[in-house]
Amino acid sequence: MPDILMQFDVAAEPATVFDALTTKQGLAGWWSTRAEVPSAVGQVVKVSFPDAPMTWDLRIVDCTKPDLLAWHCVGGPPQWIDTDIAFGLGHKPEGGTLVLFDHRGFVEADAMFRIVSYHWAHILGRLASYAETGKPAPYANF
């Protein structure tokens, strides 16, 4: 099974990055301005995108501030169903955050996998920028 694995630095503290991942305002700052964002393990985050006929439904598996956010995809495009997404956040001694991003469990490295890989790279750059500056630049702005 192919996986998407990325590592990048953010010039913001882990708690700031964590809030960008786990709050409605945070997700609206870098991913989508239309999202339902509960905060408890077992609840489902629902993210919408323009022209998409469905929401991306992500069950919260772990939400340990400020170290880890993990989701399990329970709704969305067929290629996403039963995949797992995790954001590991580590404090850098010199300041800032080391982000370890995993999106695991794709069935095959098909065209959709390649598209998702490309878009995650683009979107995660927006996450870093938002956490560093506080200026929203969402991927999907309704």
Regions flagged by a language model, labelled:
Residues 7-11, 46-48, 59, 88:
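Generic structural detector for well-ordered beta-strands
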Residues 17-21, 27, 45, 60, ...:
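Hydrophobic pocket/interface hotspot
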Residues 13, 47-48, 115, 142:
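Alpha-helical scaffold segments that form or flank carboxylate-/histidine-based iron centers
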Residues 105-142:
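A conserved amphipathic terminal alpha-helix motif
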Residues 39-44:
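Short coil-to-beta transition motif at edge beta-strands of beta-rich domains
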Residues 36-37, 51-94, 98-100, 104-106:
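Hydrophobic-ligand binding "helix-grip"
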Residues 1-36:
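Hydrophobic ligand-binding cavity/cleft-lining segments
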Residues 1-3, 15-16, 45, 55-57, ...:
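Charge-dense, helix-prone N-terminal extensions
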